[in-house]
Amino acid sequence: MIKAFENHEIWFVTGAQLLYGGDAVVQVDGHSSAMVDGMNASGLLPIKVVYKGTANSSKEVADLMTAAEADKKCVGVITWMHTFSPAKMWIHGMQILRKPLLHLHTQFNKEIPWDTMDMDFMNLNQSAHGDREYAH
């Protein structure tokens, strides 16, 4: 970690929704935590990334962005849409956030499991048009 960033952090927030049930959100949290752990363990980032949870509603997004704005240690936010997270759910929160934003447009898995892919996998791992809308 670069000394200039030792008292700062970047927040990682995952977007999802409860459409697919609580079990899916638990899996989303696991994937998100693994990504953040991997980022921090890589030694490639000059700053610590802190997982702040999965936002499943407009209120949760707005609350997280308000907290990010108020926290002097937070210098920016990384967002990742794991399951289908409607872009409109993020509008108010993005209007609150004035710190730098990085949006990851990717999936959790390194490889797509073409041979075993089913609708449960698709529902858990899609971000679909909500992710694309969010990026704009």
Predicted regions and their residues:
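Metallocofactor- and cofactor-centric catalytic cores in central/energy metabolism, strongly enriched
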Residues: 1-136
